[in-house]
Amino acid sequence: MASTFSDTFSASKGELMRRAEDGLAANVGDSGLTTGEKVALTCRVLFDAGHDSGLAGQITARAEQPGTYYTQRLGLGFDEITAGNLLVVDEDLNVLAGDGMANPANRFHSWVYRGRPDVQCIVHTHAFHVAALSMLEVPLVVSQMDTTPLYDDCAFLADWPGVPVGNEEGEIISAALGDKKAVLLAHHGQLVAGASVEEACSLAVLIERAAALQLAAMAAGPIKELPERLAREAHDWTLRPQRSQANFAYYARRALTRHPDVLTG
């Protein structure tokens, strides 16, 4: 074993990264949870991570039938969501499964899903530091290693379109998002569009941390930019599916400890 370890000291960074990728592929996989269970866990994870703002915000994920998705019932906070009280709605927000009604603001989720077939999960919240940063009408600045999954992957909507319950807001927000993973919405909050529930949950945790770091750094002095090549390398490295799965598994364990009812039917 010592000999094998020593052999890696002459390896290039690229080779070591490939070895690590192979290790991730061999050791990290899907949790086996249903999509609804993952959405419910994401609600609890983000509640604990400071994304609570009363009944504001929605966390959705594509359901099994095309053109449908899971969402919360209007009137429930993130800390009350379980796998059993989620709704399944169509693009027009008609309830197909579950009791109650969806938040009318889910309409812009429908616009994003329709325009981005690659998106499997959307997290929209008014997290405290994100909301504070949004009041300054400035883009998110990614300048710290932990937040590089968002490097050059967070758009900015500088104009507040008002309460997002109409098709106009859906068009504006989905256009601002473009092909990015996230968008900071001035005077509003944030939206993350993930390739999986795990990725969306992880990025939502990170965008609130990135906003908090940016506000703290701005108070101390000018923020220095990351070297572009290294930042892109870090973005691609940290945004791999297995990394999102590993992150989510950790967040889920914490959520299950604090909220043992989350997976109840």
Segments the model singles out, each with a brief description of its role:
Residues 2-265:
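Glycine-rich flexible loops
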